[in-house]
Structures are given as C-alpha cells and as structure tokens.
A protein has these predicted regions:
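Generic N-terminal amphipathic, Lys/Arg-enriched alpha-helix
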Residues: 1-10
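Conserved, mostly hydrophobic/aromatic
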Residues: 15, 38, 69, 125, ...
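N-terminal capping/small domains of soluble enzymes
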Residues: 18-21, 28, 39-52, 65, ...
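Active-site loop/helix belt of alpha/beta enzymes
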Residues: 128-247
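Active-site loop ensemble at the mouth of alpha/beta enzyme cores that anchors a bound cofactor
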Residues: 205-288, 294, 301-302
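C-terminal accessory subdomain/extension
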Residues: 259-360
Length: 360
C-alpha cells in the first residue's frame, strides 16, 4: 500500500512510554508535571499518548492549541504558557485554567475578562532568574504579586520561572532556592497560599536526577524530554526514554550519480547563503519531497547512518545515499529523526501529513 509523503509518523505507544517514565521520575520527588503539547500543535495523537500518563495538566503556548485540547475531551486542567495580550485575555480565560503572566497589565485584563465570564481565573507569576525571557525581575516580584493578588477575579496560584530557552541558562539549586524563597516572601506579603512553584521545563530534569532539586519546587512543564526523549542541555538520550518517537518520512523523487561540487560560477543560494562544497568526486545523490518550507535540513538526522543530508531548497531535500545501508530507488522512503526545532516546523507545515501509529 502506498502512503503519501512527506509525512510525520507519530508513535503513540513510544511517547506514552516516555511520558510515564519522565512523570514517574518527577513524581518520586514530589513534583507534578504539566505535559507541554506545543511542539506538535496539540495533535490528537499526542494527546492520546499523554492521557493516563500521570500528568496533572496539559500546557501550550497557543490558544488555538488549547482549543484542540478542549475538543479532544480530556479531563485535565490546561495551562497557557505564553502570556496573552490584553486583547486576547477573554480567549485565554475561556480556554485555559491557568495562565503564566509577567505584568500587572496582563493580570488586570485577565481579571476583567474573568469577571465578564463569571469565573475566577488562576495565574502564575513568572520570575526571571537569569535566562532573560519572560518574567518580572526578582526584586520586584513581591510588589507585583501583591498588586495582582488584590484583583477581584484572579487567584495567584503560585510562581514560576523559565530557563535554558532564550539565554540557555542552566537550572541550578541556587536559582530554584531563589524562586522558593520569593514564593515564601509573596505568601507572607499577601496571605495567599501560592501553592504552585513551577521550576521550569525539561532542562530541570538533570538537576532533579542529581538529587539537588529543592523540596519547595513542586511543578515542572515538560515537553521535549517526553516527546523526543532528550536531555535538553546537551540533546543526549534521557534515561529510560526512547528517541524514535516521531519520524519524518520523505519520498525519493530523483536518484542520480552527480559531481559533489557545482559546475560554474556560484553566488548565493535561494536563501541568501554562500555555500561551500568539498570535492568528493561523483556521488549517488537523491532528492526527497521535503524542503525548507517543511523543515530545516540541519534539523533532521537520517535513520540510516550511511545517508548524509547535504542541504535543501524550498521544496527539495538533497541527500547523499552512496553509503546507504539499505539500497534506494525512486519511490523509496527515507526516514529522519527530527530535532525539537525540526519537529516544530514539520508539525506546523500543512504540507506534511500527520499519521499516528501504535496505541498507548
């Protein structure tokens, strides 16, 4: 049976295995997990893999993805990871149970929207402990939380932070202790319990595994370690997980032996880059029906170790198959393991078919 390419094969059973492994590791140290779905746009196959995994909530950065979670009918609370603009506050209140925020203006808009909807909305105040993405600076946290706690239709559920995303800052015991101490100060200043202390994302797992995670951290937002089974600090395999959870499959549309260096004067390629080539003589090269419109060539790794990705234009992926372990021909399929960035692109591309396999 012929199956269309390009396609993204989502192995539900393998992701479910990873989810159970990672969530069990966290649970052993009293940490609850919000499973992050954004890299795959909250695809139903991913949601099926996460259902019953032990996660306490589902988290995403996009309101549209939270809608998909609601439509799937999963009985889990949701968390909006990216603060909404004031104009999007009503939608945030409608589709999220918790929202991460970092400014009073956003909190005020959420409170107004919650009042209009007749609900009480939970917010988590983000504190920037050094990665320089979102979050109030630590010396302003108590003041900001105290102001927000007075808004009529909000509940400040706790504090959170984010590391190893923009600045690549590695989570440490000291940074986690700072967050716990700030929570305690905010609790004293407001009289609110602020029970949730969300210490970060998959980057916190090595600290957890080392036994150095402070007891006050009770929540993490985990995506890549579950979906791709990677230690995000160095992309090595995370213990107890699989890395073959999602495969990008392309079909070969041309197979020819060609020189390894272009012939003629060269300038920039279609994307404004100047490319350098090494003369390796004649090589057997294949073109797959994938391109940069679907995924960056540097963000995928062939499953066959003898295949090498050479580059891509918008719609053509060029690979060297001279040393392929499995012979290929026009019409053959080539499998690739995507990085986090590669999976993000392929999941977003409407040109890549998504196909679920296996059962949780």
């Amino acid at each position: 049976m012929n199956v269309e390419t390009p396609r993204l094969e989502i192995h539900i059973d393998r992701i479910a295995h990873n989810a159970s492994a990672v969530i069990s590791q966290c649970g052993a140290q009293g940490i609850r997990v919000a499973a992050v779905t954004k890299v795959m746009q909250a695809h139903p196959a991913l949601l099926r893999a996460l259902e019953g995994s032990g996660c306490v909530m589902l988290a995403d950065s996009r309101i549209d993805n939270l809608k998909r979670i609601a439509e799937a009918g999963l009985d889990l609370p949701t968390m909006l990871l990216r603060a909404p603009t004031p104009g999007n506050a009503p939608e945030a209140v409608r589709w999220a149970d918790h929202t991460l925020i970092s400014s009073y203006q956003t909190a005020e808009a959420l409170s107004n929207a919650a009042g209009m909807a007749g609900v009480r909305h939970k917010v988590v105040m983000m504190v920037d402990v050094g990665d320089l993405r979102e979050g109030v600076w630590p010396d302003r946290a108590v003041e900001e939380v105290s102001r927000i706690a007075r808004l009529p239709h909000l509940e400040v559920a706790g504090l959170g932070t984010n590391l190893a995303c923009f600045g690549g800052v590695i989570p440490t015991r000291e940074k986690m202790e700072m967050l716990v101490a700030l929570r305690d100060e905010c609790r004293s200043a407001t009289g609110h319990p602020l029970e949730l202390v969300s210490g970060g994302n998959s980057a916190n797992l090595p600290l957890l595994a080392s036994g150095e995670m402070p007891a006050g951290i009770n929540h993490l937002r985990i995506g890549e370690a579950i979906i791709l089974g990677r230690n995000v600090l160095d992309r090595s395999p995370w213990p107890g997980t699989r890395q073959d959870t999602v495969e990008l499959v392309g079909g070969i549309i041309e197979l020819q032996r060609k020189p390894s260096v272009p012939i003629g004067r060269t300038g920039q390629d279609a994307f404004g880059n100047t490319t350098h080539f090494t003369d390796r003589g004649l090589r057997l090269r294949a073109i797959c029906d994938l391109g940069r419109q679907d995924v960056a060539p540097e963000a995928i790794e062939p499953v066959d170790p003898g295949i090498e990705v050479l580059g891509a234009s918008s719609d053509h992926l060029i690979i060297d198959v001279t040393d392929a372990e499995t012979p290929v021909r026009v019409g053959s399929e080539v499998r690739f393991l995507p990085s986090y960035g590669g999976l993000l692109s392929a999941s977003t591309s409407s040109h890549v078919r998504k196909m679920a396999t296996g059962r949780p």
